[in-house]
């Protein structure tokens, strides 16, 4: 086997009892690969482990978990200064794994791990909200965000992404669209939004293609607004067809400003952020990520 530089796996604490993962790591170590492993316990651990990875001189920091873990590790990487910043590797171990799925990361642990260590490192974009919080995949607001935020952890653990749909149907009678105004480059819209998707990536909420035209290295954010006065009729309409659907508003820009008369909540790769004013901008070529050669999200 060819020699590969060392890597450090930052593993979400929920995945520590994953026996197949342990076996895959041990097998690669026996083949001569150097793989350090660190386990997160609380917020901030990933940033500390990234600094440790740089001291080790590893070529790759692997995010082992769901979209939230990928977000935390990638955010820590783009905050690094200097040369020789490690690339991001992805090992999908979460409930939905939306970003990993959309970029074509293999489901098989051994294949995903090998890609994370030895795949080509390609410069990709990230997005930043209000000059602080970042996301690598998508910011979603409205009905869908409240569902994913409020869905019980036990339900997600038992049913996976289907749990979001079940919980949404249970809450249908209590949820209303959000009134807001959105501006971007050559874009302006105001009205009642059922769901707002601002994507660097394409899908969220367990496989929902909210921004099907998004690319992760084009310097743009894709916007999709699903409109409607009543939740259920509008939801049925948006699920039918995208073509000439009056309930779907689309736009593309390197930035978007969102204003609302009341607090609305955006889900940034699984992390909620509430407020009335949001400035979301793309950070072009913010980090390098090890991706498959046929990744569909590259231009």
From Swiss-Prot:
Cofactor section: Mg(2+); Ca(2+)
Organism whose genome encodes this protein: Escherichia coli (strain K12)
Where does the record say this protein resides? Cytoplasm
Q: Which top class of enzyme applies to this chain?
A: transferase
| Location of the active site | 271 (proton acceptor)
One GO BP: phospholipid biosynthetic process
Q: Provide GO CC annotations from the record.
A: cytoplasm
HAMAP family tied to this protein: YegS
Task: List the InterPro entries.
Answer: ATP-NAD_kinase_N, Diacylglycerol/lipid_kinase, Diacylglycerol_kinase_cat_dom, Lip_kinase_YegS, Lipid_Phosphate_FormReg, NAD/diacylglycerol_kinase_sf, YegS/DAGK_C
| Quaternary structure and interacting proteins, as annotated | Monomer.
Residue sites binding Mg(2+) per the record: 215, 218, 220
Name recorded for this polypeptide: Lipid kinase YegS
GO MF annotations in UniProt? ATP binding; lipid kinase activity; magnesium ion binding
EC code(s) of this entry? 2.7.1.-
- UniProt xrefs under SMART domains: DAGKc
A Pfam family annotated for this chain is: YegS_C
């Amino acid at each position: 086997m060819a020699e590969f530089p060392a890597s450090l796996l930052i593993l979400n604490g929920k995945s520590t009892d994953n026996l197949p993962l342990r076996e895959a790591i041990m097998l690669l170590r026996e083949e001569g690969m150097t793989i350090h492993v660190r386990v997160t316990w609380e917020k901030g651990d990933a940033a500390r482990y990234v600094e440790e990875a740089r001291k080790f001189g590893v070529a790759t920091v692997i995010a082992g978990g769901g979209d939230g873990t990928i977000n935390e590790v990638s955010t820590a990487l783009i905050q690094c200064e200097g040369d020789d910043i490690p690339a991001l590797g992805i090992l999908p171990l979460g409930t939905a794994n939306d970003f990993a799925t959309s970029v074509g990361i293999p489901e098989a642990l051994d294949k995903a791990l090998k890609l994370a260590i030895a795949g080509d490192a390609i410069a990709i974009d990230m997005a930043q909200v209000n000059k602080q919080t970042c996301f690598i995949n998508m910011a979603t607001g409205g009905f869908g965000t409240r569902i994913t935020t409020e869905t019980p952890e036990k339900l997600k653990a038992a049913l996976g992404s289907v749990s979001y749909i079940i919980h949404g149907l249970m809450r249908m009678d209590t949820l209303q669209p959000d009134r807001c105004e959105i501006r971007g480059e050559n874009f302006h819209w105001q009205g009642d939004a059922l769901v707002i998707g601002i994507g660097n990536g394409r899908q969220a909420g367990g496989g929902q293609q909210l921004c099907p035209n998004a690319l992760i290295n084009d310097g743009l954010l894709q916007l999709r607004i699903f409109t409607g006065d009543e939740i259920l009729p509008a939801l049925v309409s948006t699920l039918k067809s995208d073509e000439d659907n009056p309930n779907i508003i689309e736009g593309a820009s390197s930035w978007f400003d969102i204003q609302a008369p009341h607090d609305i909540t955006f889900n940034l790769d699984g992390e909620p952020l509430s407020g009335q004013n949001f400035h979301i901008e793309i950070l072009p070529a913010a980090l390098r990520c090890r991706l498959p050669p046929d990744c569909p999200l590259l231009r």
